[in-house]
């Protein structure tokens, strides 16, 4: 059996969880759901699938120390900082080079750092099926999540016919990847029963994904070859990444590879999954009070319903006579937003970024 690795993508900002999520302490370094940072939970989940030394974390320079604190059991060299974000195709290319350096015939998974999965046993079984699939043929393997509703916030994967059954799990051919649809289109997808949410989880062998880069993303492939050569000539990744990585084409792995490839299969997820994309999404993971309020930290609600109140550092946050709000208090910033407007946090952060006096709150 080929050697197996997991590469965890932990470079996002988690903007919709501001003000708890900041540039140096983003969503995946917070205990949004559970008692441990989300990155720590992700590392713990994959420990039963690959050895500790075969787990890499890709992050940013600003988040590097935070990721090291969240992953004390990983070798320091396995936590690698991108000098700047270049989207998921470049991150996949860097992962390819890191794993290839260790074993050019290995299989590796690319996984997000900030998803909530409670059924760890079933998750590990399913991830092993994805590895088995990638090693059974020259395939790009993705894990698809059964839609819970017509969500416009996800890309979708349309399944084709049965490729084969492995360990009791059906592995399906992929007809196509599609970008985030409008509501009517999403409803149509659900009606067919052929579509999965694209959760950004992939498994592939080094030679297979390298061939996909060469065939479908020639410009990026050339940049990765330059990065690989620079790392060899300098004896390490730091100098090579600083010199070459910012020049890599900025594009998602879906656009660069998955939408153009025909050798793709999807393993339908058999475990619970939630990407917890914004503050309102945490409500389902906690027990509300008798009025539907979710309270985290030292918080209270009087004469109000269906609020989410999160308060840090022992500070009492109290709300009275309001409903359907998200209230988040931190030592440096406080957010009050209606649940229906939680997606507008990104627009607020853009205003902060454009204001010299307020940029410090990002």
Language-model features, listed with the residues they occupy:
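Conserved core of the sugar-phosphate nucleotidyltransferase
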Residues: 120-245, 265, 339
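Alpha-helical scaffold segments in soluble metabolic enzymes
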Residues: 28, 41, 45, 66, ...
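Short coil/turn connectors at secondary-structure junctions
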Residues: 2-5, 52-53, 75-76, 103-106, ...
């Amino acid at each position: 059996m080929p050697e197996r690795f997991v590469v965890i993508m932990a470079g996002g900002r988690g903007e919709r969880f501001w003000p708890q999520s900041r540039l140096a302490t983003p969503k995946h370094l917070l205990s949004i759901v559970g008692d441990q940072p989300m990155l720590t939970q992700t590392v713990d989940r994959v420990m039963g699938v690959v050895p500790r030394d075969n787990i890499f974390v890709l992050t940013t320079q600003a988040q590097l120390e935070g990721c090291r604190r969240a992953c004390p059991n990983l070798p320091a060299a396995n936590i690698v900082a991108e000098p700047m974000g270049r989207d998921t195709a470049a991150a996949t290319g860097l992962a390819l080079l890191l794993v290839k350096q260790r074993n050019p015939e290995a299989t590796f998974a690319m996984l997000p750092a900030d998803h909530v999965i409670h059924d760890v046993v079933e998750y590990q079984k399913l991830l092993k099926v994805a590895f088995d699939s990638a090693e059974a043929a020259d395939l790009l393997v993705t894990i698809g999540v059964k839609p819970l509703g017509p969500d416009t916030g996800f890309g979708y994967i349309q399944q084709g016919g049965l490729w084969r059954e492995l360990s009791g799990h059906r592995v399906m051919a992929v007809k196509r990847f599609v970008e985030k649809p409008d509501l009517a289109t999403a409803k149509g997808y659900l009606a067919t029963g052929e579509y999965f949410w694209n959760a950004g989880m992939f498994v592939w062998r080094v030679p297979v994904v390298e061939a996909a880069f060469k065939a479908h993303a020639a410009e990026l492939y050339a940049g990765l070859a330059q990065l690989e050569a620079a790392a060899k000539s300098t004896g390490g990744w730091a100098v090579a990444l600083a010199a070459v990585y910012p020049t890599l084409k900025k594009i998602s792995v879906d656009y660069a590879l998955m939408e153009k490839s025909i050798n793709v299969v999807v393993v339908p997820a058999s475990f619970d999954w939630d990407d917890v994309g914004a503050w309102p999404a945490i409500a389902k993971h906690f027990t509300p009070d008798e009025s539907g309020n979710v309270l985290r930290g030292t918080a209270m609600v009087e004469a109000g319903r269906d609020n989410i109140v999160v308060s840090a550092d022992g500070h009492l946050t109290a709300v009275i006579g309001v409903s359907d709000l998200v209230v988040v208090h931190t030592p440096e910033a406080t957010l009050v937003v209606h649940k229906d407007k939680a997606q507008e946090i990104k627009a607020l952060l853009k205003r902060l970024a454009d204001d010299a006096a307020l940029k410090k709150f990002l």
